[in-house]
Amino acid sequence: MKNFSLLTTIEGLRRLAPAYDLICTRLPIPTDQDLALPIGGKKNNLTRRSWLNFAGYCKIPERAAVRLLNEQIATTESSVDLIYASFLPDKLKAQYEAIVRQNTAILSA
């Protein structure tokens, strides 16, 4: 792991943060790759099947991987709501929404 963050609970327990360093680099750098590290040898144009194959490689049962992908897809509208509640300029909000919807369509196919 290169970038990670720890959270400390009230009880003093430490655990990995569920998300860290999340930023849409497509807004400032439209030609940026989808991923920094390859999944199945690819950094771009990953499909739902690409992610399911990677889950299999990681020994995650396909049923669980499908459930996780579907849960991600189900967060689309709340993700878009967060975008529009942000301090981004309106033009960038619309571009960010388009990226989220494009990625959702890919995961849904």
What are these model-derived regions, one by one?
Residues M1-A109:
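Anionic ligand-binding catalytic core segments
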